[in-house]
Amino acid sequence: MSNIPELFGSLVFNDTVQQKRLPHDTYRRLRQIVASGEPLTPDVADVIANVMKAWALDHGVTHFTHWFQPMTGITAEKHDSFLTPAGDGVIMEFSGRELIKGEPDASSFPSGGLRATFEARGYTAWDPTSPAFIKDDCLYIPTAFCSYTGEALDKKTPLLRSMHALNREAVRFLRAMGWADVTAVTPTVGAEQEYFLIPKELYEQRRDLRYTGRTLFGAMAPKGQELDDHYFGTIKPRVMAYMKELDEELWRRGVMAKTEHNEVAPAQHELAPFFTTTNIAADGNQLTMELMQRLAQKHGMVCLLAEKPFAGVNGSGKHNNWSLVTDTGRNLLDGGSDPANNLTYLLMLAAVMTAVDEYQALLRITVATAGNDHRLGASEAPPAILSIFLGEALQNTLMQAACGEGSTAATRRELEMRVPVMPHLRQDDSDRNRTSPFAFTGNKFEFRMLGSSQSISDPNTVLNTAVAEVLGRYADRLEQSADREDTVRTLLQETLEQHGRILFNGDGYSEEWQQEAERRGLLNLRTAPEAFAHLTEEKNVALFAKHGIFTAAELTSRQEIHYETYAKCIRIEAATMAEMVRRQILPAGQAALRELGQTSRAKQEISPLLSCKAEELLGTQIANYNDMLLAGCTLLENLLRDFPSSTEEQKALYARDRLLPAMNELRQAADALEQMCAAHLWPMPTYGELLYGV
């Protein structure tokens, strides 16, 4: 490996490269544009494009692409070469117009009715706050994507809008709190990414993995995660080689990959980066997922990002670590040396409490997918109920501050290891609560409900917007206040009285919490379609309209896309199951019966006195499972044939209420048959082979 500081960002047109290569006036103007949010002028764009092209050509680049994030949840790109005819030859050109604007076909991406097939024009626009980078001899330019009529058709545009809204209201709030030196507040995120690695040759033998990204059949292996021996265990050499190359490729492209380790389930791993500005973190996470999958193939493996690729062991999520940082370098979620008397810090915590409580449904919607429904509430991931963990010490501090009591910082004691040579460790104010969906972890909030394959843009868009709304209210009160400290304490009191129900420090997996949450009036949206229905509620439409995030039409379109994607995912899985049963699993069951019959006949040929009881019992069981499979497969095929052609919502409800139960029953019969069949007859790799094959 080369020198890491030299390697890091070597394929990124970052601030260092810009400062070195751009004319001084152009560089200064670009920085001013990025800081102020002003539009990029054509003359500045032309200079930047020319310098960017020269830098890219120095790295062997031949093409460029506007890299955007449509509402498919994955990235999209179209490669154009720098080639331009010049007489009998060609020259390499890249104009400012090509840098700042592209025109992909908007009708071919999900639009929820915003674009029809005959309304194809869409635009991509350069996001100058997220630096361009090089991959596969191509210059990747991060862009936003909108329709011909200006509606957002991507995940980046609303995210950037929400960051602007949060900055505006947070600066107002801080000014009202006496922070005169702050001119900008930026949300930052670090997204922990979980994934599975399995052998490529086994993946190729599983139709369910190839078509859907997860297994739809499979009996549990004798050993799963019961011994807790995989979590933080020794990383296998093949996986370590993969992680090493992944780190290097991410570092080259400016993604600050920091930590990697084995996760709880066999074959499960995690990568965590440093925090960075939210839109850059979102771009970085999309790039991370793409490189994870590509490099795994190079190492003879396949990276699975599905939320629940294997039944019976933990699924994969993505923890969204969110905080707010001022342009003066202060983390607003860091209480400093005296958090008990840091009123700005305490009011920031109250703002997040209020935002999460008032907009529970919106946060739940951002993590609602067909895949994530298999995780949430399954005693391996947070429940589908939103709650916040602060820890008893911090919760008590908030209560004391609200009451105006003389708060003192809690004394943090040293841990007694009872080994003289060991260093003294200071204990944190509170323990960690891994069952909480939204936990305060010292200087950030960790939103743990995201699915592993999801973009982090949606949850951060909602979180930024909801917190902006609350900070705006606080600013209104504080700006009219004659006694700031008294107003702060009143706001803290009101928050605890009106939104204290969202705080929960106990076991989120327990049945008692389900009952308690219901008593508190918290939402428990168990399935994705239940959540989607709340998106266009009046208060949510009003929130997004007020802060310029979504129009009513944009919000309705997203609701349609949510329903449509959910139904399509389940429909594809159901069709895959039917095909696998017809063409693989039932034939295996018939072959097992055939072998038993041959064994029985062979016994009788040896001696009529030999017992065939084992063959009879096994044959009866296998025949029963075969009958169940045929009946279940026929039912599923009929349900697929009768799939409604009505609204997207009705399709999603049909998929949830009719297809999923039939799919679950079909799987039970197939998994039982797998355990009855001889290994050489089973037509696909087993869980044991997949999970322990690397």
Residue ranges and their predicted role:
Residues 43, 63-66, 261-263, 319-321:
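Histidine-centered active-site/metal-ligand motif
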Residues 73-90, 104-107, 112, 206, ...:
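Short linear, low-complexity motifs centered on an aromatic residue
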Residues 120-305, 314-317, 324-562:
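Glycine-rich, acidic/polar active-site loops that bind/position phosphate-bearing ligands
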Residues 1, 6-15, 168, 172-175:
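Flexible inter-domain linker/hinge segments
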Residues 44-48, 68-70, 97-98, 145, ...:
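Active-site-proximal loop/turn and secondary-structure-junction residues that shape catalytic pockets
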Residues 7-119:
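Active-site core of metal-dependent hydrolases
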Residues 69, 87, 297, 327, ...:
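Hydrophobic alpha-helix feature that most strongly marks membrane-spanning transmembrane helices
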Residues 492, 497-694:
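C-terminal amphipathic alpha-helical interaction region
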